[in-house]
Swiss-Prot record:
Record organism: Prochlorococcus marinus (strain MIT 9301)
Metabolic or biological pathway, per its Swiss-Prot or TrEMBL entry: Nitrogen metabolism; urea degradation; CO(2) and NH(3) from urea (urease route): step 1/1
Keywords, in A-Z order: Cytoplasm, Hydrolase, Metal-binding, Nickel
Protein name in the entry: Urease subunit alpha
Lineage: Bacteria, Bacillati, Cyanobacteriota, Cyanophyceae, Synechococcales
Enzyme class: hydrolase
Amino acid sequence: MSYKIDRNTYAQTFGPTTGDRVRLADTELFIEVEKDLTTYGDEVKFGGGKVIRDGMGQSQVRRADGAVDTVITNALIVDWWGIIKADVGIKDGMIFEIGKAGNPDIQDNVDIVIGASTEVIAGEGHILTAGSIDTHIHFICPQQIETALASGITTMLGGGTGPATGTNATTCTPGSFHISRMLQSAEAFPMNLGFFGKGNSTNETNLIDQVEAGACGLKLHEDWGTTPSTINSCLNVADKFDVQVCIHTDTLNEAGFVEDTINAIAGRTIHTFHTEGAGGGHAPDIIKICGEKNVLPSSTNPTRPYTRNTLEEHLDMLMVCHHLDSKIPEDIAFAESRIRRETIAAEDILHDMGAFSIIASDSQAMGRVGEVITRTFQTAHKMKVQRGPLSQDSDINDNYRVKRYISKVTINPAIAHGIDKHVGSIEKGKIADLALWKPSFFAVKPELVVKGGSIVWSQMGDANASIPTPGPVHGRPMFASFGQSLIKSSFTFLSKNSIDQNIPNKLGLQKKCIAVENTRNINKSHLKLNSKLPNISVDPQTYEVFSDGELLTCEPLDEVPMAQRYFLL
């Protein structure tokens, strides 16, 4: 006999289904479930008197015969490819299937077999996203990694050697010695890591040495001299060894202007950091480079979104990060040339248009490592409030906008750096790096983080309590953060050449090392939902930004969501 229940009761029991809408945190963003892959009346749920019991939702199938290791039940998946309700099966640390879980002996259309070997994570009423990827890391202190993990980041790419003066300013791990030591250090952390070598050298041998030592990319930074000749040399090596080049261009325009940099790049693929310019780059018009097809443009989070405090905080940040002296007028002028209200305001709109494709942190070097996802969706909220629904959306949901913005911190950085085969989205066959969120805490604090198929971080109450929930509840490392589980659950990204030369074994690395690939034959059109190529111009006197002749401007926000009410301590 069938039994009908109202939508509200169903959502409270099994989570929202097709047509239901969910508000994201305290923003004005609303998502609507596009499709439900579970089966009405045949849903699986764990608990006393519930479905996942032996002979009911749990089958007799052994692990060796197809039962999964873990199932996340009734989760609301938010990814670039859709917003759907589904069960997610995990096996051997990989995403095994997305669909309907259960017992095929008594249930129809079962994609994910639950057996005695299967653990359950209750996804009902929760949002599931891929673990996010931060591709602009200054590895200044190891404590960044825990902070990033607590925010839902599961992959960090960048450069540095610790709190050295060079690392405080630039995302470079220079030379084979430092690359080797950072790769060895990566063994200690429950995070996917990869390191950029220093790309500033006209002698290509210096760059080749770093790629062969294990660098997964090269970084050009103006503080080391980003001239047309170093740009050309760096890209030559990248093309030969299939690694990505990231660039922080010449703010002072000493070696040329933005047009000269574009000419030096010569149509080759490159990832431009803080493309608006406050983080550095040709003043005042580096922002126009986002209209080039071969450029993969990203932002860093201190300018995300534009608020009444954005300009004021930047000057001091910049002086510290780039080792400038407030007693020297030229240093002050250098700093002030990078901070422009007009280009920061335009950056908001360019993100909303899909012309800027990636958001990262710039950790401890003008950016906040634990706020990448939060600031991404604060920007989305601001644009919804100021610009209204996107043309692809309706008055009742913001699905396209949300998918556009989640892409900026998941799949697009993965594509840009040649790791999208492994991470960056919830798709069959990829590493099970996942973040589970209560909708009220979406993009602020994940309820738990799964790393390589094991729980690595979770909101957790008092360890001496009789149940897990009594306060104080806060994020804490879980078992996949320790011992050999850490080694098996996290990965290190290197150049293919270094893996071919057996660098992991020579350095005694235990983590699985994965080669980056397909970084040189991509362009902006490969980036998901963020591939617009506007014709950008900047007025050299007023700094006003125009896209295809239209002025791009917006007002700063006085108050953002996902802020004080979530961080009272």
